[in-house]
Curated annotation (Swiss-Prot):
The lineage of its organism: Bacteria, Bacillati, Bacillota, Bacilli, Bacillales. It comes from Listeria innocua serovar 6a (strain ATCC BAA-680 / CLIP 11262). It is an enzyme of class 6 (ligase). GO terms for biological process: tRNA modification. The gene is tmcAL. Keywords: ATP-binding, Cytoplasm, Ligase, Nucleotide-binding, RNA-binding, tRNA processing, tRNA-binding. This is tRNA(Met) cytidine acetate ligase.
Amino acid sequence: MKATGIVVEYNPFHNGHQLHLNKARELTKSDVVIAVMSGSFVQRGEPAIIPKWERTKMALAAGVDMVIELPVSFATQHATIFAEESIRLLDALHIDTLFFGSEHGVSEDFSTAAKTVVENEAAFNETIQLALGDKKTSYARAYTDAFTHLFGKELLDVTKPNNILGFHYALAIQKQNPSIALQTMPREHSGYHDAEASHDYIASATAIRKLLLAGNLEEASRYLPDSSIEVLNNYRGPFLSFEDYWPLLKFRLIQASSDELEGIRGVSEGIQNRMQLAAKKAHSFSDFIEIMKTKRYSNARLQRTALQILLNAQNTPPAEPYIRVLGMSKTGQKYLSLHKKNISLPIVTTVSKAEPSLLKEDLRATDIYTLINGLEDYQAGDFHTPPILTL
């Protein structure tokens, strides 16, 4: 069986995702599509708008054959780690092709860039470190400048969010298993972070979340497939943003000592001291981020650091990667059965039977995620919710 892998968040699953999924199956001529998906918290350092189980239902209903969870210690990291660990899981599942959307849309350019960076890695990293010597320069800017220095601006614009993720997927494949084919499709209509919908049936997940958080499910439905609308209509919990977790984060910042926070993943350069001061002044999470924002620290980096503090994620090596199955179609079940003996990573379908150290961070993250009123039905869900299976 030929397998295509995709890296997703489905926050929530919308018409653009449906187009991407359909093209993945059509263009790669695969028998099975495997999605590695962020769980309770996503890459920009935010809570998912609805629980991972609801997003898994959306994915399966739309045609994904297997949904596996990207562990939170990787899912909430910067693009390099996010991509490396996503590819590690998909490679363990023996995918033939990685399919992704990008603003650039030319597969060969991603592969060319990745191969060149690997061949010139020492010089590339040195250029980044030199740029970071300027305390006003963010890591993202330093990385972009190093890339432009190596290639010029013609090959690939890595200031675009899908391009930079695609490049890191290509880089991870080049380092881990260059035999995995890389295929992209151009992103259509809506920009990744567009806050407003600007098309009849395609809108960014950002714009859709904004509508849902404002209570405009009917308007948001224009941009969702019927299968996602059905999941949302049956969902009885709240739509979530970091504002819901602000009291918990504020308590944590006020209660903890600076030395304690210094041991949290992503905390560096004394940023915890500024965060503790900002927490006392801010009245909301958006207010907190606005107070904290500088040229060196992007919103995404600040949110990721704040999230690590909320989750009490210690700056120690994360657990070994594992394959946590959230859901499968009948085809996905057949594929897993065929390959199970040849999969090098631990496979988790029943949490209570898994090695406790593997899932420690993810279980804590889900426990914190479900502290919000209205999510009582999902509390301890990692223990009593089996993989969702469809016929």
